[in-house]
Regions:
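Cytosolic regulatory regions built on CNB/CRP/Popeye-like sensor folds
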Residues: 1-174
Length: 174
């Protein structure tokens, strides 16, 4: 329901695992594990590593049109898209799309600053959600995850640099 997690600054009309909608099916840890196995971010992880992620996260279902994070708000959760797509709106880039396997919300956890983007569910979503405390524990326990997140963040920074250069040159980026 609406009070799904009083500590979370991401005020989301989530359905938590306790009151799951029928569409979501079973939410046993085995079912959650199956979901995680489909996420490229976790590909090649051992069963143990995946179980650690399952233990430190929850899977929630969000209706299309829901604002998942609001730019300028404090952020306390890291999100990985399992099913569905979201639109990310930032001050400079309206509407990059994130798809299954993509993650968001990491920047506020890493630097403590407010959300840098407004993220809206374009479709019904199934999200893996990790809160701040669990996020740091998870990074301690799963060094591979740090490497992967850093690699992806580096790519994002490069893309952003290319976009900025293209704007400065007066051409639009590819």
């Amino acid at each position: 329901g609406m009070d799904f997690d009083a500590r979370s600054a991401d005020r989301l009309p989530f359905h938590d695992d306790d009151e799951v909608t029928p569409a979501l099916g079973p939410t046993s840890s085995d079912a959650r594990l199956r979901h995680l196995e489909r996420v490229p971010l976790f590909s090649g992880f051992s069963e143990d590593e995946l179980r650690r992620i399952v233990d430190r996260s929850r899977i929630v279902e969000v209706a299309a049109g829901t604002v998942v994070t609001e730019m300028g708000e404090p952020g306390d959760s890291f999100f990985v898209i399992i099913d569905g797509t979201v639109a990310a709106r930032t001050p400079i880039g309206a509407g990059s799309e994130l798809k299954p396997g993509d993650f968001f919300g990491e920047m506020s956890l890493l630097d403590g600053e407010p959300r840098s983007a407004t993220i809206v569910a374009s479709t019904d979503l199934r999200l893996l959600v990790v809160d701040r405390t669990h996020f740091w524990h998870l990074l301690d326990e799963t060094p591979d995850l740090i490497r992967r997140i850093l690699t992806i963040l580096s790519r994002r920074v490069r893309r952003l640099e290319q976009t900025v250069h293209a704007i400065l040159r007066g051409t639009s980026p590819a």
